[in-house]
């Protein structure tokens, strides 16, 4: 499947929650993994790095990895993502710790695009669910963009909070070279999550910001979604809350 077949872009962030706090000694341990999957547009590299830093600070993560594909290096493949997840989970308590996996990329109704060398592969919702299920991590959060509503059904449950920048039938916006954030990434990570450590509150604020921006530019609503995570709220509550983080342009 070629990149031109993908409509708009996708920012997918997966957070497998298996506790790991830095802020509260007795709380859950958190690992944050972020990947920018399309190197031909620098926004995905910038967003992966920025999102990882902000989420890690909010959750008090000890283990933080930001690994994007770039214009000169494209070694983040579907297999590499799976290997990184397994490495992180091997150091965690699978029942009680938190793994956050952030993926930012182009996308389609079939999943997210991964530039593997000269090829473009698709990481599907079922493949992602299989990867996370195979490592045995219980608690997870998924955050994504274009058509990312397709990830809700396979991944959202009481132990998995899924946040998407668009529903299953629409794209999200802001995918272009030489900018730092996509629309949803800017609203959720760079704005709302800097003000609050509450992911649900941050999502609601980000959804309103994105809608206002879409109206201004007369764009078809991306309709961000949130689902699942009933058991995640208590875990995140144990990490405590950091003070407001300064906004970045």
Model-flagged regions — what are they?
Residues 31-34, 64-68, 99-103, 139-144, ...:
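Structural recognition of the beta-strand scaffold that forms the well-ordered cores
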Residues 22-96, 174, 179-182, 236-249:
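Boundary/activation segment at the start of structured domains
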Residues 59, 135, 155-159:
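Short, structured coil segments at secondary-structure junctions
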């Amino acid at each position: 499947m070629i990149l031109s077949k993908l409509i708009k872009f996708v920012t997918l962030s997966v957070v497998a929650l298996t506790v790991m706090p830095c802020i509260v000694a007795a709380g859950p341990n958190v690992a944050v993994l972020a990947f920018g999957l399309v190197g031909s547009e620098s926004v995905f590299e910038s967003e992966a790095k920025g999102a990882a830093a902000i989420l890690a600070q909010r959750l008090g993560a000890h283990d933080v990895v930001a690994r994007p594909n770039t214009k000169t290096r494209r070694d983040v493949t579907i297999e590499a993502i799976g290997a990184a997840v397994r490495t992180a989970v091997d150091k965690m308590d699978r029942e009680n710790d938190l793994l956050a996996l952030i993926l930012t990329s182009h996308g389609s109704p079939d999943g997210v695009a991964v530039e593997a060398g000269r090829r473009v592969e698709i990481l599907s919702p079922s493949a992602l669910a299989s990867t996370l299920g195979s490592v045995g991590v219980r608690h997870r959060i998924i955050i994504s963009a274009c058509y990312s509503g397709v990830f809700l059904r396979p991944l959202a449950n009481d132990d998995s909070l899924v946040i998407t920048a668009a529903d299953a039938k629409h794209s999200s916006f802001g995918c272009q070279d030489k900018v730092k954030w996509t629309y949803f990434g800017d609203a959720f990570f760079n704005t709302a999550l800097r003000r609050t450590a509450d992911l649900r509150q941050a999502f609601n604020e980000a959804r309103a910001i994105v809608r206002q921006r879409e109206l201004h530019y007369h764009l078809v609503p991306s309709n961000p979604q949130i689902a699942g995570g009933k058991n995640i709220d208590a875990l995140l509550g144990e990490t405590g809350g950091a003070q407001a983080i300064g906004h970045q342009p």
